[in-house]
Amino acid sequence: MKFIIAPAKKMIRAQDDFPVQSQPKYRAQAGELLLLMQQLTFSEAQALWHTSDKLTQTAYNQLQQSDLTRQQSPAIFSYSGIQYQYMAPDLLDDAGLVYIQQHLRILSGLYGILRPFDGVVPYRLEMQNHLRLPHHRNLYDFWGNRLYQALARMPGPIINLASDEYAKAIRPYLQAKDQFIDVRFAHRVNGQLKTRATYAKMARGEMIRFAASHRLTKAADLKNFDSPTYRFDSHLSTATQLVFIAK
């Protein structure tokens, strides 16, 4: 069983408490993308990122100084968005950290796909950003089926905890033999099911921590996810979607 999650826009240079254990599988390709980005003007970068002047200046300065081989920190501690805060990987025991290195993959616009302890540097590039590429229509086309192929080499079903933007990099390449299971966290609003992004991000992080803490190996075990906000709904769930409804 392997989980896929989205990265976070907000990144930090993590402390040295947890060392880098591996290098990104597609670091060479990430280097190509970084070089293209470093050639952008300030205005082009701002248009790419859709950021304010202040945030663009910070990100642009960081971009010009970026070197994928220096000052790396483990990916799982470098992303600091809500999902990662609620995952709280720094609170996992050693066995839990081994579990996420084996079972968790982070999809990335720059790096393609990452293991939790792959060494990364802060960057700003979402999969849906319209980076001008010489031989490809967009980043989805650039990455092609490589992210799927990396997952296909791992045994068991794919548990999708990623946003639609990132799951879109995997879905077109799924084969009939693949078991791809979406996880949905929803609220009932006026008789309809609605996803509340912030709460969903929290729950995704908590589910990864739950799986790692209990060393889960079967998708069915996720039904027992102990969430303070959501409860598994067997009536709405199917073989390809696990649905959790707000309590």
From Swiss-Prot:
One of its GO terms (cellular component) is cytosol. InterPro entries: YaaA (IPR005583). GO terms for biological process: response to hydroperoxide. Belongs to the UPF0246 family. This is UPF0246 protein LSEI_2080. It comes from Lacticaseibacillus paracasei (strain ATCC 334 / BCRC 17002 / CCUG 31169 / CIP 107868 / KCTC 3260 / NRRL B-441). The lineage of its organism: Bacteria, Bacillati, Bacillota, Bacilli, Lactobacillales.
